[in-house]
Amino acid sequence: MNASIHHVNVTVPKSLEDAAKHFYGVVMGLTEVPKPPESRGRGGAWYQLGDLQLHLSLEDGLGADCISKRHVCYTVSSLAEAEQKFREAGVEIIPDDMPTAGWSRFYVRDPGGNRLEIAQG
């Protein structure tokens, strides 16, 4: 079997759909791609992320107890520019608590509490 990743799915509460779409579409600058007709009624959005896609899904019953270290790592060309953009959008920067030689990074959380690692690519 030859496996590869097509998409990553993150979930947010239905009440945070607009905030999450703003976060991924405006703050992160991802391009929204059309969802197939059978998926459009479910809400959320799909975004192109290089050769992969990020699928934003809506799910009730998510709360603060769902916060964890699970994350997706996004590489950026300039860590300083990314940090500035997040700060300007009011997103809290979570410093790297376990620095790794040769790997500069920080973390943020989307409106639904999903953790994102932002690393210099």
Q: Predicted regions span which residues?
A:
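Vicinal oxygen chelate
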Residues: M1-A3, E88-G121
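N-terminal beta-strand motif that seeds the catalytic metal site of vicinal oxygen chelate
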Residues: M1-K21, R70-V72
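Conserved active-site tyrosine of GNAT-family acetyltransferases
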Residues: A20-G25, F86, G113
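Short secondary-structure junctions
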Residues: G29-P37, E92-D97
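Conserved short beta-strand elements that form part of the metal-binding/catalytic scaffold
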Residues: T31-C66, R115-Q120
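Residue-level marker for the onset of beta-strands and adjacent loop->beta junctions
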Residues: G43, R70, G102-S104
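Mid-chain, well-packed structural core segment of small domains
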Residues: D65-E88
